[in-house]
């Protein structure tokens, strides 16, 4: 059926058609090869923006460092990072004046968090730079390795399990003259197989000890590993992102906790809320500006874009902000929060894998690791790479580049938002002292500025003043990429506002489709995505019905589970036809067993098993929901699971979906090839860690506990919890005396074993 696309838009107001212009269908671009070039770009650009600053040398690591703070005031419109300390402090003071008590209260909230956060908070997150192995690892493994090394070097504060104690260890580790670390390596040897008498290669994993002196350790502790950001749409060039190591992460977490607490209290902040809550917050600011400008004033809005936000921010400025925000707070608290910006002022950027060379004539490939870039002859490189390397050479130490100015992407989103809002806050009439005034919205580096004035000259003057005020704190509004409109039409964080927010449905397109977890989860996630978009994103009933039909079709092709009475032949069709024929109530078969689809837009909230339960043959029910079915390795049954869905913008979102455990909720087994590699020891550590955490969660279901505070270990906490629960269950008659006695005995045994250890 041919559709003339223009017909689709006859009834649609033009602003709703914004969706069709977004680059969100199809696969996003991924990066291949090394990120070294992108990282060098970042380092060189950052230094260029701050080039008129003062050069110093770090006494501990010998790294050359550039400090642009209080540098020359800009004379042109080029981006620059010369923030003025007194201007930043004054902006903070005015922010506090217009929000009395905001800093004080946020500090109190943060102090409570600091005292209660457990070190396992650092296991959240994906890849983390593991300084012991000098490469990226899953967060939990990197943390376990760090704690293991600390312990073997006599640092034991972290055993209490509080994050703050782990951070004490980090501080102490930096004073040590040397650290002993364990690295994994692989040995291969040829042995004869007893059974087949053939020679086979046997791999063994070894751990070897290695001593690292203070300077090398500091460099590793201050290193951010870099990667290329994947799946970025609408860009021609890729860019580098950073992943910090465990020494930095905890400190950053506390700073961001404080900043988040402040952002929650600021009406102009687009963080940390999201979705509909964010839209409501933003609509309020717009409403305020429009109501005040009805008769006499003009109101204009800038859809703003900042040039290289991260590369012009400066950790020293963040230190000044924190010093101001935490004034009058206890000394220990101020110290803990100052460490993150200080570490960032001394950070090192790891250049990644290096370059790959291949000779077409000799069919040779060779890797030039980043460590060699300092000394290699540049004649092998092309013009642009040669320039990059020449520029970065003075900054190189052991394959990392000293990068004092600038903040790598995504590290201090909340705190930089506070800085942005403090400039928006200066737009009140009592501060501008003229006829123009401004307000706006800020979310990390994205902003919208609303300026009101009696006439066009006033608007122009207001924008100019805002622009210049931003320059004073190292924020560079891009005159090329920002545009101005009558208030009522603007874009902010990919929300399009036209007398109210317009649903930008194309953003959600990537999350439609089959996720590929397993048959049960995929069905549930698929219909939940459609349901959520009907609620939040103006997905109309007709389109939703069509999306549902397309999803079912996609699902059937993915799992080769076409209806039992279909003509389509697949590997599964023989089995599914047989099942179809011997089933009395065919409507009861799940779609993944070749059954019909009973979903429509009214019942998307019901899990498929529940929807069809009454229609199922009894023996089918028995097979489907039988935990003893030998073909299924079962997850524990939780009524609500979390799926990771990929919206087009921003990070992957976690989305809840109802999960009914059936024989279709299988978990694919881990690929065995990993078991023969040097990763094996790491894998075992990780599984061990996982088991401990799961066990702990069993004792303290997250709904019922605030993380235990104090110095008891996980084991002690679990034992005492078991005793309490057992006593309650025994006294209420839920368990017998014998069972109670047995539990008590087990608890004592565990304590005894711990004492012997």
UniProtKB/Swiss-Prot annotation:
On subunit structure and binding partners, the annotation says:
Influenza RNA polymerase is composed of three subunits: PB1, PB2 and PA. Interacts (via N-terminus) with PA (via C-terminus). Interacts (via C-terminus) with PB2 (via N-terminus); this interaction is essential for transcription initiation.
Could you give a single Gene Ontology term from the biological process aspect? Answer: symbiont-mediated suppression of host mRNA transcription via inhibition of RNA polymerase II activity
Q: Where is the stretch described as Promoter-binding site?
A: 249-256
| InterPro entries per record | RNA-dir_pol_NSvirus, RNA_pol_PB1_influenza
Top EC class for this record: transferase
The molecular function terms in GO held by this entry are: nucleotide binding; RNA binding; RNA-directed RNA polymerase activity
Signal sequence residues: none
Assigned EC number: 2.7.7.48
Keyword Nucleotide-binding found: yes
UniProt-annotated location(s): Host nucleus; Host cytoplasm
Entries under PROSITE patterns matching the protein: RDRP_SSRNA_NEG_SEG
The segment annotated Disordered runs over: 52-82
- Posttranslational modification, per the record? Phosphorylated by host PRKCA.
The reaction(s) catalysed by this protein are:
RNA(n) + a ribonucleoside 5'-triphosphate = RNA(n+1) + diphosphate
Protein name (database record): RNA-directed RNA polymerase catalytic subunit
Pfam families cross-referenced by the UniProt entry: Flu_PB1 (PF00602)
Q: What is the lineage of its organism?
A: Viruses, Riboviria, Orthornavirae, Negarnaviricota, Polyploviricotina
One cellular component term (GO) for this entry is: host cell nucleus
Family assignment?
Belongs to the influenza viruses polymerase PB1 family.
Location of the RdRp catalytic domain: 286-483
- Return the motif ranges for Nuclear localization signal: 187-195, 203-216
- Renumbered to this chain, the Polar residues biased-composition regions fall at 55-64
Keyword Protein transport in the entry? The reply is: no
Looking up HAMAP family in the UniProt record yields:
INFV_RDRP
Could you list this entry's UniProt keywords, alphabetically sorted: Eukaryotic host gene expression shutoff by virus, Eukaryotic host transcription shutoff by virus, Host cytoplasm, Host gene expression shutoff by virus, Host nucleus, Host-virus interaction, Inhibition of host RNA polymerase II by virus, Nucleotide-binding, Nucleotidyltransferase, Phosphoprotein, RNA-directed RNA polymerase, Transferase, Viral RNA replication, Viral transcription
Function as written in the Swiss-Prot or TrEMBL entry: RNA-dependent RNA polymerase which is responsible for replication and transcription of virus RNA segments. The transcription of viral mRNAs occurs by a unique mechanism called cap-snatching. 5' methylated caps of cellular mRNAs are cleaved after 10-13 nucleotides by PA. In turn, these short capped RNAs are used as primers by PB1 for transcription of viral mRNAs. During virus replication, PB1 initiates RNA synthesis and copy vRNA into complementary RNA (cRNA) which in turn serves as a template for the production of more vRNAs.
């Amino acid at each position: 059926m041919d559709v003339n696309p223009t017909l689709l838009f006859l009834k649609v107001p033009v602003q709703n058609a914004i969706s069709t212009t977004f680059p969100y269908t199809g696969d996003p671009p991924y990066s291949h090869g090394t990120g070294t070039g992108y990282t060098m770009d970042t380092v060189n650009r950052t230094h260029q923006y701050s080039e008129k600053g003062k050069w110093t040398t770090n006494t501990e690591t010998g790294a050359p460092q550039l400090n642009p703070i209080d540098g020359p005031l800009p004379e042109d419109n080029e981006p620059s990072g010369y923030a003025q300390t007194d201007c930043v402090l004054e902006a903070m003071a005015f922010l506090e004046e217009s929000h009395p008590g905001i800093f004080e209260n946020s500090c109190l909230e943060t102090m409570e968090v600091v005292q209660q956060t457990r070190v396992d908070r650092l296991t959240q997150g994906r890849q983390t730079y593991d300084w012991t192995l000098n490469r990226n690892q899953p967060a939990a493994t990197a943390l376990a390795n760090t704690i293991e090394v600390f312990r073997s070097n006599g640092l034991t504060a972290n055993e209490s399990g509080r994050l703050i104690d782990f951070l004490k260890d980090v501080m102490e580790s930096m004073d040590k003259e040397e650290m002993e670390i364990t690295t994994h390596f692989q040995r291969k040897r040829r042995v004869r197989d007893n059974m087949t008498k053939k020679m086979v290669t046997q791999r063994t994993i070894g751990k070897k000890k290695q001593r690292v002196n203070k300077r090398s350790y500091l460099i590793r502790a201050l290193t951010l590993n870099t990667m290329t950001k994947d799946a970025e749409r609408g860009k021609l060039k890729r860019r580098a992102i950073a992943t910090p190591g465990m020494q930095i992460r905890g400190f950053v977490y506390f700073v961001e906790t404080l900043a988040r607490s402040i952002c929650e209290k600021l009406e102009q902040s687009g963080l940390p809320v999201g979705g509909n809550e964010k839209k409501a917050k933003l609509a309020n600011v717009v409403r305020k500006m429009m109501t005040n400008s009805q008769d006499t004033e003009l109101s204009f809005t800038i859809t703003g874009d900042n040039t290289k936000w991260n590369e012009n921010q400066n950790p020293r400025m963040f230190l000044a902000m924190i010093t101001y925000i935490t004034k009058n707070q206890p000394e220990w608290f101020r110290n803990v929060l100052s460490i993150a910006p200080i570490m960032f002022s001394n950070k090192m950027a790891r250049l990644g894998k290096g370059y790959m060379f291949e000779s077409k004539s000799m069919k040779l490939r060779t890797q030039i690791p980043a460590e060699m870039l300092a000394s290699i002859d540049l004649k092998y490189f092309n013009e642009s790479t040669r320039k990059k390397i020449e520029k970065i050479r003075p900054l190189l130490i052991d394959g990392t580049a000293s990068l004092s100015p600038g903040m790598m992407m995504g590290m201090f989103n909340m705190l930089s938002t506070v800085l942005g809002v403090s400039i928006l806050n200066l737009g009140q009439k009592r501060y501008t002292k003229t006829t123009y005034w401004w307000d706006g919205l800020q979310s990390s580096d994205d902003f919208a500025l609303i300026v009101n004035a009696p006439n066009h000259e006033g608007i122009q003057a207001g924008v100019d003043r805002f622009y210049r005020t931003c320059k004073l704190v190292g924020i560079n509004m891009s005159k090329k990429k920002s545009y101005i409109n009558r208030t009522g039409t603007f874009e902010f964080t990919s929300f399009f506002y036209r007398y109210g927010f317009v649903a930008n449905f194309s953003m959600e397109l990537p999350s439609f489709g089959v996720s590929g977890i397993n048959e049960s989860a995929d069905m549930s996630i698929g219909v939940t995505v459609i349901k959520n978009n009907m609620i939040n994103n103006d997905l109309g009933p007709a389109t939703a019905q069509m999306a549902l039909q397309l999803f079912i079709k996609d699902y059937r092709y993915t799992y080769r589970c076409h209806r039992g009475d279909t003509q389509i032949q697949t590997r599964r069709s023989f089995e599914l036809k047989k099942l179809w024929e011997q089933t009395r109530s065919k409507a009861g078969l799940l779609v993944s067993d070749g059954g019909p689809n009973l979903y429509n837009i009214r019942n998307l909230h019901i899990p498929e098993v529940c929807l069809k339960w009454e229609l199922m043959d009894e023996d089918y029910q028995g097979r489907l929901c039988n935990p003893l079915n030998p073909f299924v390795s079962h997850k524990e049954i939780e009524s609500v699971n979390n799926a990771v869905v990929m919206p087009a913008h921003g990070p992957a979102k976690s989305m809840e979906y109802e999960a009914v455990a059936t024989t279709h909720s299988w978990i694919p087994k881990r690929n065995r090839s990993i078991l023969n590699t040097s990763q094996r020891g790491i894998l075992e550590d990780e599984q061990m860690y996982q088991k401990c955490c799961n066990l702990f969660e069993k004792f303290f279901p997250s709904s019922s506990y605030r993380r235990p505070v104090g110095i008891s270990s996980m084991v002690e906490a679990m034992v005492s919890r078991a005793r309490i629960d057992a006593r309650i269950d025994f006294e209420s008659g839920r368990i017998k005396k014998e069972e109670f006695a047995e539990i008590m005995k087990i608890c004592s045994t565990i304590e005894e074993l711990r004492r012997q250890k």
